[in-house]
Amino acid sequence: ELELWKWDDEISQSRQKYEQIYRSREPQYVYHVDSKKCVLVAPSHMTNIYSPTCDEYNYVIIGDETPYRKLTDWRDGDAADYYLVSLETGDRKLVFPDLCERPVWSPNGKYVLFYHGKKKAWYKLEPVSGELTDISAAIGFPVYNEEHDLPKPANSYGIAGWMAEGNEVVLYD
């Protein structure tokens, strides 16, 4: 079997063959029954939607891997730009570009945690206010893999769990 490759393929032929994730998906919408309004949450090229596990919420995080697809074969890990999206208006705000670890919602949907590998820090986002806070600075111990010796940012040790109904988080150090 002959495969023809182009030097500027967004996705390498071998990856196209084995990964269905890069296929274009349908855009994602929210329909508000009361106002009869349809809101675009994620365009078709944004493949990852992260939502809280609680029953009612007004925001989601979407990940856009498009800018980093050409780099996937050259970097260890898939990077994405992460946006906060209002389900009421569809407004989209860039929270972090070029992150490799996925966001984690608190169980109550009040907070989203992001690990920033280049800064070796955990950040808490409060979706309603848009406030972004470095929560690992006060810990006093590394929250990243100290024995990491690869030419990429160190991974986090991870999240141990949530307490106080999702208002407090326990991080591994």
Outline where the language-model segments fall.
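Beta-propeller folds
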Residues: E1-D173
